[in-house]
């Protein structure tokens, strides 16, 4: 049974609070929306802390961004949300936030495009980086246009991240995965570099999506994520017998 508009408003309140509690937004950062139907979108207002919203704070606007109802002004970045909905009819919710580590990668001009974690390869493929665009203007959306149809989560140059999904909780969980992936990626760099999965394993993971009921095509035809072979990495693999032989030779050399 479809949710009521009131229930959707409460969903945005709940997700906004979780985003704020996790430290993915500061002050009035971030915005959230849910597509109510073909003609209307429910979105967060501008200039409000996402951890302190109430259901009645939300704005209903049309697919051109014009306010239909609400006592506050809509988010200034509604165009980004509408662009996602126009390019992806399967999407019902969009979440934009500034998770610190993922945003650090975006500010450094770095995408999260390596095949490091099975869960990320299966669920997101990878998280590409879109060029910087001035917030609150069409310049913000333009760099996203070629990427939105291909991926489920994007980094935004010097800005943050945007995730979208079939509902607001799916968008939230994708944002959580992006930040988790960014933190692990950073740790691998601090430890001297990542051991990237080989192409054969990436292919197996992408094929496993059907088994898990995951419908995204990210990573299947767009050159992302990058496997070990594409980075010139060779995975060092030896058998148990070879290890024993190497240890024996090393011990003999010390005599």
Which role does the model predict for each range below?
Residues 1-255:
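Glycine-rich flexible loops
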């Amino acid at each position: 049974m479809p949710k009521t508009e009131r229930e959707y408003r409460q969903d945005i309140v709940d997700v906004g609070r979780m985003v704020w509690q996790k430290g993915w937004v500061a002050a009035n950062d971030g915005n959230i929306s849910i597509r109510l139907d073909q003609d209307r979108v429910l979105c967060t207002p501008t200039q409000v802390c996402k951890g302190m919203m109430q259901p009645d704070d939300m704005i209903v606007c049309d697919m051109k961004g014009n306010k239909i109802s609400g006592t506050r002004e809509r988010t200034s970045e509604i165009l980004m949300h509408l662009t996602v909905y126009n390019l992806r009819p399967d999407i019902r919710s969009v979440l934009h936030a500034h998770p610190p580590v993922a945003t650090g990668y975006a500010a450094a001009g770095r995408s999260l495009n390596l095949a490091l974690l099975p869960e990320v390869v299966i669920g997101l493929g990878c998280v590409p980086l879109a060029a910087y665009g001035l917030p609150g203007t069409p310049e913000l959306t333009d760099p996203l246009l070629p990427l939105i149809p291909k991926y489920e989560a994007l980094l935004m140059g010097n800005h943050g991240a945007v995730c979208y999904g079939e509902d607001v909780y799916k968008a939230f969980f994708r944002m959580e995965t992006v930040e988790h992936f960014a933190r692990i990626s950073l740790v691998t760099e601090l430890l001297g570099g990542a051991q990237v999965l080989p192409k054969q394993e990436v292919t197996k993971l992408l094929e496993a999506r059907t088994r898990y009921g995951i419908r995204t095509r990210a990573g299947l035809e767009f050159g992302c994520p990058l496997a070990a072979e594409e980075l010139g990495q060779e995975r060092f693999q030896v058998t148990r017998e070879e290890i024993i032989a190497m240890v024996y030779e090393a011990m003999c050399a010390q005599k």
